[in-house]
Amino acid sequence: MAPVLQSSQPWVEKYRPKQVKDVAHQEEVVRVLTNTLQTADCPHMLFYGPPGTGKTTTALAIAHQLFGPELYKSRVLELNASDDRGINVVRTKIKDFAAVAVGSNHRQSGYPCPSFKIIILDEADSMTEDAQNALRRTMETYSKVTRFFFICNYISRIIEPLASRCAKFRFKPLSEEVMSNRILHICNEEGLSLDGEALSTLSSISQGDLRRAITYLQSATRLFGSTITSTDLLNVSGVVPLEVVNKLFTACKSGDFDIANKEVDNIVAEGYPASQIINQLFDIVAEADSDITDMQKAKICKCLAETDKRLVDGADEYLQLLDVASSTICALSEMAQDF
């Protein structure tokens, strides 16, 4: 089938909820923030949770519902991971924006337009500790005229003095049912055909990240047209074919290092990312049948975790996959080895 005509707008933006009440699967957060919008007086806020669950969407929706399109640009400052947010930026750009007072007479019909500004710091957990400490003083000094919205995946990376000054909102991972409903809505709007198997595959490979699922869907549509299959989605997602990972695990179960080494050579030759191999191998091991004991699973998973850390640190992928293969063989053969 010929590819369907597509606009240049990313579907992530096209189908981003414009109001807080439209955010999916975050009922408690939506209920509290809806009450906040009615009073038009919000505290500093900290949104945390897995990626693709609606944190940024919620922050933007609050700002738009408070100020409307006309005042939004002058009242809201957005900074994300692509911006320099070191200590110098906190002391200059953020402080300068926070310090400017706003009058209550600048109102837009239909919007509360409270007399404060909002600074949205996306991926705040990537800010240095020095920058966060500098930001604490800015929050204290200009709290009457500026509200801060922090967005992060890991709340543990936000220093306590900042976190304690914010109302915290935890965003739950999206269930497969919620993701499926949203994906089907987009398919209906775009005239796409997506069968049950493809829908299940999309939910699985996106791992609860709705933003990622929508991106995969749009990419598959551009490449393969309006009828999308599971294979199409696997091709655009970068997921390693299951048979490739199964072959590696089967080779390790054989106890023959030469066979396992050959499978590692094939994986490297095909250019599959080692980190993705590790993730999928973990799932296979965790779901393995009763011929593998819990202790063997624990040893293999520990090795996979250590390998994943080394890959993040820049270790050679070929050597790390060989280490995984040999360690898995040892664990499955119950050879004495210190893991």
From Swiss-Prot:
Any one of the GO CC terms: nucleus
SUPFAM superfamilies membership: P-loop containing nucleoside triphosphate hydrolases, post-AAA+ oligomerization domain-like
Keywords: ATP-binding, DNA replication, DNA-binding, Nucleotide-binding, Nucleus
Domain of life the protein comes from: Eukaryota
Residues that coordinate or bind ATP: G49, P50, P51, G52, T53, G54, K55, T56
GO molecular function: ATP binding; ATP hydrolysis activity; DNA binding
Pfam families given in the database record: AAA, RCF1-5-like_lid, Rep_fac_C
Main localisation: nucleus
GO biological process per UniProt: DNA replication
Localization: Nucleus
Role noted for this protein: May be involved in DNA replication and thus regulate cell proliferation.
Family of this protein: Belongs to the activator 1 small subunits family.
Subunit structure: Heterotetramer of subunits RFC2, RFC3, RFC4 and RFC5 that can form a complex with RFC1.
Record's protein name: Replication factor C subunit 4
